[in-house]
């Protein structure tokens, strides 16, 4: 988990990047439709969290790089890399190039990641970590 005491305004990530801003606003709206989240801004990225961060964005010129944290390996057409972190934490990397990339399948995975961020997700038959 990264940490910085420097206060960076959210808008600073989008200077000269109107397409990336539109994509981020669509991504944020889709997540906020599932419930309240906290937006934490650092110099290099934007983290989206409930009790813990579960997704976020690195702003590129005209797209977003993102990850989502799940307790299982999942598949989606946008995933560019999937990493196992520890015993049962999976980090799924993806990019959003168009609003249509935020499809129903991705939204379902983001709902699941939100449960991980809520620290409420325990896979069936497994004891809490």
Where are these regions (language model features)?
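Charge-dense, helix-prone N-terminal extensions
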Residues: 1-129
């Amino acid at each position: 988990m990264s940490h910085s005491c420097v206060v960076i305004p959210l808008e600073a990530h989008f200077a000269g990047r109107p397409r990336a801003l539109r994509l981020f606003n669509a991504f944020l709206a889709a997540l906020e439709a599932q419930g309240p989240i906290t937006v934490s801004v650092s110099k290099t990225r934007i983290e989206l969290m409930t009790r813990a961060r579960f997704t976020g964005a690195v702003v590129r010129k005209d797209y977003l790089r993102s990850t989502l944290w799940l307790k299982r390996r999942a598949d989606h057409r946008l995933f560019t890399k999937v990493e196992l972190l520890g015993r049962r934490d999976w980090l799924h990397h993806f990019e959003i190039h168009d609003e249509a990339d935020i499809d129903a399948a991705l939204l379902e995975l983001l709902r699941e990641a939100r449960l991980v961020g809520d620290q409420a997700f325990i896979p069936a038959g497994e004891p809490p970590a």
